[in-house]
Amino acid sequence: MIVDISKKPDVFRYARASANADVKKCNTAVAAKAATVASRYLPFLHPLPLSATAWCKDGKFYVEGIAHWQTGVEMDVLFGVLVGLLGSGAVKIENLRVEIKQKQTTPPIIENVNTSEAPITREGDLVASAYGRMKVVNLDIVKNPVEKGHPIYAAQTAAALNAKRLCELLGGPCPSVQHFKIEIITSDSVEVRTFIKARDITPAPEALFSAGVALLTIWDMIKKYEKDENGQYPYTYISELHLD
């Protein structure tokens, strides 16, 4: 279910997300663009008129966004960081988190940053697998249906669909996926493993992307339970996402 926001007022919504990764290039243009279209890939997000920018500094990748709208933009900028780092060639991402989110009646000031774009380089075998782990406050909620549906089932479906769509965001050829599977485990955290086999080019970025989408889908579905009294997410983050 996509939550009804029709009675909410339009206010300025701002969020900044970041993650750590060792990359030689920063595909910030792809990150900013991905944030603006996140609702096409994360199934329960509302389309919104997001303005986004991205930059790299001291081993961290940042995306921030603002919209005058009825719902928050934190999931959109998280998605932007994920796609931006994959477009930058990252094979290991750590501490993907929301640094801050705000709701206010006056527009926040965001800096104009020159974004850059670089073609993705695909290297690897025709079989790829990825692992991701997300820390959450309310692990039991992940295991049962919530207002939007069942987090695990929705995440499995979103991952499978998005395993074939990363090339829309990064450009270049799309792997001809022959097999995909996903496993989601809830123990002391939310763990995801994906496996992809392709016919022609390596699906390594797709393995990472589908695992990341699964975790972000779960986060989006339970986010109302993860916020603290100030509406922030101090204890919810994707601690690791990497190729196996």
Curated annotation (Swiss-Prot):
One of its GO terms (molecular function) is cyclic pyranopterin monophosphate synthase activity. Keywords: Lyase, Molybdenum cofactor biosynthesis. Homohexamer; trimer of dimers. The active site is at D220. The keyword Lyase applies. The gene is moaC. Pathway: Cofactor biosynthesis; molybdopterin biosynthesis. It is an enzyme of class 4 (lyase). Belongs to the MoaC family. It catalyses: (8S)-3',8-cyclo-7,8-dihydroguanosine 5'-triphosphate = cyclic pyranopterin phosphate + diphosphate. Catalyzes the conversion of (8S)-3',8-cyclo-7,8-dihydroguanosine 5'-triphosphate to cyclic pyranopterin monophosphate (cPMP). The keyword Membrane does not apply. This is Probable cyclic pyranopterin monophosphate synthase.
